[in-house]
């Protein structure tokens, strides 16, 4: 029986791009710190192989991710952002558009996208997910991206 699993250590030429929404920057900075720490410490990705792209808000994440994915410069994309429920339906439109767009980009272009997009009801829930109490969703997105790089390489090499 064949079992394909990815590990989280990548080659020294692996290139990762992190796309971060500037809106809710105080929260997203913590996500970014967790992402970078995990890429370097766990994945052993070198500084020169990490690119950070800032975009205005979460709605812009899919467009920039699409442009980066078709550039063929990166082995994975990690997106970071925070969408906090407001009093309007704008919240649902934004998070559904982001998730749908990012999913399509990953599937269509065969580029792993580590999803570090927080969707919360309030600021307290967002703070719980940025690592102050032990878990950082940016770090989790980085781990998923690293593992997916290796899984896709294994599949490609087995064909």
From Swiss-Prot:
In this protein, the active site sits at 90
Q: Which residues bind 5-amino-6-(D-ribitylamino)uracil?
A: 23, 58-60, 82-84, 115
Among its keywords, does the record have Transferase? yes
- List the catalysed reactions: (2S)-2-hydroxy-3-oxobutyl phosphate + 5-amino-6-(D-ribitylamino)uracil = 6,7-dimethyl-8-(1-D-ribityl)lumazine + phosphate + 2 H2O + H(+)
Q: Which GO terms describe its biological process?
A: riboflavin biosynthetic process
Q: What is its EC number?
A: 2.5.1.78
Under the heading PANTHER family, the entry gives:
6,7-DIMETHYL-8-RIBITYLLUMAZINE SYNTHASE, 6,7-DIMETHYL-8-RIBITYLLUMAZINE SYNTHASE DMRL SYNTHASE LUMAZINE SYNTHASE
What this chain does, per the entry, is described as: Catalyzes the formation of 6,7-dimethyl-8-ribityllumazine by condensation of 5-amino-6-(D-ribitylamino)uracil with 3,4-dihydroxy-2-butanone 4-phosphate. This is the penultimate step in the biosynthesis of riboflavin.
Q: What GO annotations for molecular function exist for this entry?
A: 6,7-dimethyl-8-ribityllumazine synthase activity
| Encoding gene per record | ribH
Q: Write down the Pfam families for this protein, in alphabetical order.
A: DMRL_synthase
The Swiss-Prot or TrEMBL record describes its family as follows:
Belongs to the DMRL synthase family.
| Cellular component GO terms held in the UniProt record | cytosol; riboflavin synthase complex
SUPFAM superfamilies assigned:
Lumazine synthase (SSF52121)
Lineage, highest ranks first:
Bacteria, Pseudomonadati, Pseudomonadota, Gammaproteobacteria, Enterobacterales
Subunit structure comment from the entry: Forms an icosahedral capsid composed of 60 subunits, arranged as a dodecamer of pentamers.
* Residues that bind (2S)-2-hydroxy-3-oxobutyl phosphate: 129
Q: In which pathway does it act?
A: Cofactor biosynthesis; riboflavin biosynthesis; riboflavin from 2-hydroxy-3-oxobutyl phosphate and 5-amino-6-(D-ribitylamino)uracil: step 1/2
- Which keywords label this protein? Riboflavin biosynthesis, Transferase
Q: What is this protein called?
A: 6,7-dimethyl-8-ribityllumazine synthase
Q: Which InterPro entries match?
A: LS, LS/RS, LS/RS_sf
